[in-house]
Amino acid sequence: GNDTIMVDVPEGEHVLYFFVKLNGYSRVILGAPGASGPVVNHLDGKAVERYLDKFSDAMHFTRGKLKGKIRAAFCDSFELEGNNWTPGMFAEFEKRMGYSLDPFLPYVFQRTGAMGEPVREAYGSSFSPEVTRDVIERVRHDFWHVQMQLFKENFIDVYNDWCHRNGLKSRVQAYGHQLHPVETSMYLDIPECESWIHDGIGRVMEPNQYLSGRGYSMVNKFVSSGAFLANRNIVSCEEQTNVGNIFQTTLEEVKVTGDRSNLSGVNHSVLHGFNYSPRQKDFFGWIQFGTYFNENNTWWPYVRPWMDYKARVSALLQNSVYQADIAILPPLEDLWSIHGMQRDPYPGVTYPAYANDLWEAVQQSGNGCDYVSEKVICQSSVAGGRLRFGSRSYKTLLLMEVESLEPRTAARIADFVAAGGRVIAIGKVPHKGLGFRDAAAKDARVKAIIDRVVATWPDRFVRVDAPQGDMLGWYRTLQAEYGLTPYAKISDPDRFMMMNYYKSGDRDIYFVVNSSIERSMQTRLEFPAEVAAKQAWVWDAETGVRHMLDVQDGTLELCLTPAEAKFIVFEKDRGGQMLPAPAPRSANPIALNGIWDV
């Protein structure tokens, strides 16, 4: 139209900010026919409930043929492309944070780019470091927290209630903008993550590059940690997702991706890409974002043995409890203050750069760990040198370059140290509070608490330099210096070999994986005396066969061939056959490279 906006500009130099507010602009990405319309406002509980009720009114989950037949309602990852506002936001912000967002709005908003990620470019006014640190970053932190609270109340809680009213479990990939990567999974019946096939799977694991050959996505460890904290026995995963090597992927790469997925805490794999395609459908059938699981694939005859293997692994892990006595508090609050919440599992910023490598090094060295949050720490009990939350119990808390804490979190950490626990602050020591309101008072309170703890128990609250380069070597040094006793000592740790420790009744279960598809791994495992007193077995998930092992003085020499995984199980049962000696290997093996004839 011909509408005009008049601005009365006083004398001097000014920067004019303007906003474009769009209502209902977002549409479902690649929606199926009939489901490609507008995206519901996830911050409006009434709109969410109306949408869900329309669905259940048509499907009748609680009566008729579907009653009791549907296990769960599934919600895929949240790719909301910039959904950051809802009617009443100003009032909600002031009610929750105690001050008005209005005067700060131009400075906390960031230009929105693809998938809701902020555009990384300079624009608008420039501010001093003090204003950026003490005002803008603190208000931004509060704004993200209000969005996170509104999302939980208006979508997660509404979705959960709707599922349970309809006799369904809630299964959700609960991460991304406006969702806490640990806590949101704790609210759900079946939290889910995702594992992808990327270039280099089984061949490379570059440091500080969360896509480099990993298989599991960076969010998997967050999701599984939340599930274990909430005592969930199912950690689901959209597995074998694939966009770059759909037809070139080998079954060997599929196996390694699945094994690594399990190492990240997954115990329930949902095969992505196992799509139904009518036989009359031309090559390559119906496939979207999945690996080519199809009867026309050359390795199709071998899919069933792999699926049997996955079923055995899942059955064992679902009936066992992953063990962890190290808690990791990542600097999420600092990240959100400085850079904003991220679009997990593909964050625009990884903070610090090694953030997704630390838990790997812990498990590559024989220890076990969970991510925790400030809320988890505050709700934990402390006694006997342990931080306890539900069934989880930790002897050591790693603060990963954490600078900011709520005063109540700092106080709980002090209680933990006073009770005999150990805190290792990596790179930085917490010294300030969170949020804009009463910032100076909260800063002083946090600093005073931490300073007192450091002065009183310098041997139990320690600061160490952040890793530079060799994460595994750095952690091994930390492990030795501070007595971080592993569940089994690994003589020759390797980035491609990882071990998870589980308990099931009186069984001690070690899941050991060689995720290299190019080389074998030879190592010596030394088990604690109370474990080694039981009979050792090897459970072969590829065949379902069990054999006893001869473990002398608690030590086992273990060789894993490329892409091989084994369960080493200690139990009281001593009746069975010993593992046969391995067949001799050729002294002159032939490498099958390039084109060859049979």
Where are these regions (language model features)?
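Carbohydrate-binding surfaces of carbohydrate-active enzymes
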Residues: A58-A72, S77-P191, W196-V598
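Mature N-terminal, pre-catalytic/accessory segment of carbohydrate-active enzymes
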Residues: G1-I70
